[in-house]
Structures are given as C-alpha cells and as structure tokens.
A protein has these predicted regions:
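Catalytic-core region of right-hand nucleic acid polymerases
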Residues: 68-206, 248, 285-334
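A short, polar/acidic, helix/strand-boundary loop motif
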Residues: 186-211, 297, 400-431, 439, ...
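RNase H catalytic domain
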Residues: 437-497, 502
Length: 538
C-alpha cells in the first residue's frame, strides 16, 4: 500500500532490480564451521537440506512422478532473460528439468523510483504444501517481537545490519537445479540460486543469518528476521558484537549493505520505531505513512476490493499490536472482516457506514502514531478472581496475594435482562466478568489473574476482540480499567465460583438453575438485544 500511483508506461519502463556482485557469494558449508550454539547449529543443519542433496529431494522427485503440476508461466522478455543469465541468476541445465518455476516481477517503490524485482516461484511448492511426508515440513522461527522490545527496554543502544540481496547470495547445489527449471520460448534455464518464491527459502535464509549473528558476547541481545540483524546492549558491548558479526560475515562470503557500525538510541527496525532513552515504541515512519494513506483512502467512501481491504486490515492490526490499540473498540469492523476475508480478491465491497466509521477512527489513531511504553516488566499478581454465571445470576471469588478471600453472589437485574440474552453463556459469562471486576478489583491493582470456565472468552482475549458483541464489550471494559488482566481458563467442575452463580437465586432450591448452554458464536447467532436488533452483517 503506497500513496503513489504509476501509469502503465511507468511500470513498463521500471528497471529489473539485479545485484550481480552478490550472486552466489555465500559459502553455506562455511557457516557450519563457525563457532555457534548447539541450537543454531541444529537449525542450520535442518535448513541446509533444502540447498544440498538430501532425502528431501528424493521424496520430491518420487512425488513429481504422480503429482499433477500447475501450468507454469513466464513474464520476462528475451532481453530481460539475457540480463538474468548474464547476472548468473539463470544458468544452463546440466540435466533436463523435472519441475518448473513461474517467473515474473513485482513492483517495488523506492526513493530512487519504481523498480521490478524478479521472482521465481518453484511449482514444487505445491508438493511441499500438500505432502504428508514429515521430511517436507518447513519450520521457520524468527526472533519474537516481544524479545526485541524487552531488549530495547533493558539496553543503552542498538546497531543494525542488512544483507544485500540475501537470497541471491545463497547457491543451490548443482544436483538440485533440475527441480527449478525455467522454460522460455528460446530454450530452457535452471535456477542456480535459492529462489525467493521457494517455500523453504525463509527457513534457509533465517537459519544462515542466525548462525552468523551468534557471536556469543555477554550482555548483548541479538535478533534477526531473514536478512535484518539487530544487536542491543551497552555501547562497548554492541561495538564488540558488531565487529565480530562483520568478521564472521566476511569469513563465509556474506555481503552486507554496509559494514559501518552505527550506534543509535533511536531507530526503525521491522516496522517499529524504538527509543532507548524514552523507552518507547511506535510505528516506523514508513508504516505511519501507510496509515495516513489508509485513512485518506477510507474517507473517500469508494467501493473497495477484497485485496484492498485485506491490506488495510493487515496494516491496522499491525498498528494495533504496536500502539496497544484496543481492537475490541472496533467490533463491527472486525465482524465485517470475518465476513469479506474469504471472498475473491477482486470482489468489490461497499463498506457499511458504521463499519467505515470504526475503520476511520482506527486509522486515525494509527496515523497519530503516539508512542507507548516499549515493554512492561512483569508485576506481582495483586488479586486472583474466579467468575461464573447462570441464567439467574452471577458469582465471583476474590483471593488477594495476602490470602484473604471475598465471595460475591448476585442476581441479574431487570436492566441486565433487558440488555442481554442471559439464557446464553456467550452473553452471561462476559457480563459476569465485568460485574465481578467492577465490584472486586480496586483501581490501584496492577495485575489480576481472572479465571473463567467460558473457554471461548479466553480465546477472544488472546485476539483482543470477540466475534460475539458481549465479548468485545467485556474486553473493552477490561482494557480501559487501567489494570493488567491475565485471562485463564478453568474447567467448570473446578470453578469455585460455580455454586455462587447458581445456588442462591431460586427460593426452595438447593441446586439452583441448570448450567447455561454454550451457545455457538456465528454470523446467525446474536447474544444481546442490541446485536440482535442490528441484524446480520453483510
């Protein structure tokens, strides 16, 4: 998503992005010889089976004999193919190819202008994706974003590096190139390099990066995502780690865009902006600019394709994770997403007015890009609360860190019955949580463990919104309370609040009303009077 539009002629004139100086510069075997942790070495050994002869390719070759491959396509002209061949990104086959690649270019907008990046998509991806053979499983693990944020919180500065055309630096063993054929009108080529469009490519690239950045210097954090590397710590320690990393890169032929060590206290990394002094994070300027564009786009009130909406929602959800935006505030926008997401990419949608209002508000908050605390230290639990609901009331138990216990049992009010369908646990359980928190949690509490036997609400809390309106209301209430709530599931038979919700609201009964049924949450089931009146989305 960008704010610039280009004519068809401008796109046609955009040059192919090729860096011949980096092609096949890396020696992957040398990476195995580097000093590194056992975990890094094990990950690297697993990844290298995709670029060296291994049982993986015997399994692929066996499946190629019966697998119905898609038709392959190519969008490069003869002059462009010659450029790719001269840059050693294509080579002549030594044996006839057994599988083919799609070959095309994607547009990239850079400061110097529009350019086209050549992409090769091996059709053996389909075999890997559909195979039940465990040999063909692909596992890629990136540095968790929360680990990066914690490192910024605990450190003085950072230094980052970026490999130049990283995939082009990684050679494919000659015996494997027959699985990566490129068919043209004038002849046949094969790929001598790791293809960016190959399903296991990120696993290979990430494992190689992890191996090289494993400098083993105390008090230094290192993180990476494919070709981007970050070191944080004290100035002296980061300088030492960066120097070692540069030397290790040179020793295996890995080319960096720059070998200059720049120690910074504020910088962008993987879409977020970090400040070591203020200890804050926000969106990078590039991502914030995209949020501005999304805001202006939404204000135009034009019909949008599924592809455009997916891009907008992806950006807004990313911003929510960075800026701690409460997604539950935008319940109807999220319901709309669950409706359109599976429709064809080119289908046009008219965004309902209430959904558009929420999306504009969301994009406005994202574009303001107000910094938030980069990381929050774990604090001691002040209270543990158990909640439960029945058709006639709710109950809760609060246990303080000092061990004092407070029990509460209340019937539903007339207003509760008027506002919510309390015969459904999907509405009753979240309402019980809201009432229990309001009654039992002081505003001074910093952290609360909240147990419920309503498992669907636990899933909703992990996503920060619930498909049921009652879930989103409860999550928004908890987010605005100023306390950190950890939502945990407890089986109903072990929930001590169960008897408090059921046993005291039916005179003459020792057992109380029956347990509430767990109502399905779906497009045709509504759990409050308000949601029912609004009608089904779409």
């Amino acid at each position: 998503m960008t704010g610039t539009s280009y004519s068809a002629q401008a796109k046609k004139r955009a040059p192919l992005h090729i860096k011949p100086e980096a092609v096949a510069s890396l020696n992957p075997s040398a990476c195995l010889a580097l000093p590194q942790s056992p975990a890094s070495r094990a990950s690297l050994e697993e990844a290298l089976r995709w670029i060296f002869p291994s049982p993986v390719y015997q399994a692929i070759e066996d499946e190629c004999k019966t697998f119905q491959m898609r038709d392959h396509r190519i969008s490069f002209n003869q002059a462009e193919l010659q450029m790719l061949f001269d840059a050693r990104k294509l080579s002549q086959p030594e044996t006839p190819p057994v599988a083919w690649c799609n070959a095309f270019a994607v547009y990239e907008e850079k400061e110097e202008g529009l350019r086209r990046r050549p992409i090769f998509e091996p059709l053996v991806n389909d075999i890997i994706a559909r195979s039940v053979n465990p040999l063909l499983s692909v596992r890629t693990t990136y540095t968790p974003r929360e680990d990066i944020r914690r490192a910024v919180f605990l450190s003085e500065c950072g230094a980052q590096f970026d490999y130049s055309a990283w995939f082009d630096q990684i050679p494919l063993h000659p015996e494997l190139r027959k699985f990566f054929g490129v068919s043209t009108a004038s002849g046949t080529f094969v790929l001598p390099l790791l293809a960016m469009g190959f399903k296991p490519s990120c696993q290979v690239a990430q494992a190689l990066t992890n191996s090289i950045r494993d400098v083993n210097i105390a008090n230094v954090f290192s993180g990476s995502c494919v070709d981007n590397v970050l070191f944080t710590g004290s100035r002296a320690d980061v300088t030492a780690a960066s120097t070692s990393f540069i030397q290790r890169s040179e020793s295996v032929g890995a080319r960096l865009k720059s070998k200059t060590i720049e120690l910074r206290t504020a910088y962008d990394f993987l879409g977020e902006h970090y400040d070591h002094v203020a200890k804050t994070r926000c969106l990078s300027q590039k991502t914030a600019d995209k949020a501005h564009y999304a805001l202006n786009f939404l204000r135009q009130r034009k019909p949008s394709t599924t592809k455009q909406l997916r891009a907008i929602y992806g950006l807004l959800l990313y911003a929510a994770g960075t800026l701690r935006i409460v997604v539950a505030r935008f319940h109807w926008a999220m319901r709309f997403m669950s409706w359109f997401a599976s429709t064809p990419e080119d289908r046009l949608h008219v965004i309902p007015s209430d959904v558009r209002t929420e999306l504009v508000c969301w994009a406005q908050v994202a574009s303001e890009n107000t910094p938030v605390a980069v990381w929050e230290e774990e604090v001691e639990v002040d209270l543990t609360i158990y909640t439960d609901a029945s058709a006639t009331g709710w109950g809760a138990i609060s246990v303080s860190k000092g061990g004092s216990v407070l029990c509460l049992s209340q019937p539903w009010t007339v207003h509760d019955h008027a506002a919510w369908n309390l015969s459904s646990s999907v509405a009753a359980e979240p309402l019980a949580i809201r009432k229990a928190v309001a009654a039992l949690v002081p505003r001074t509490a910093r952290r609360v463990l909240l147990y419920t036997d309503h498992e669907s609400f636990c899933f909703a809390s992990e996503k920060s919104w619930g498909k049921a309106y009652a879930y989103s209301c409860a999550l928004q209430f908890l987010a605005s309370y100023g306390t950190k709530f950890d939502i945990r599931h407890i089986a109903g038979e072990f929930n001590p609040a169960d008897v408090l919700s059921r046993a005291r609201h039916m005179p003459g009964s020792f057992t109380g009303p029956p347990l509430l049924p767990v109502t399905a949450v779906g497009d045709s089931v509504f759990n409050s009077r308000e949601e029912g009146e609004r009608g089904q989305m779409g």
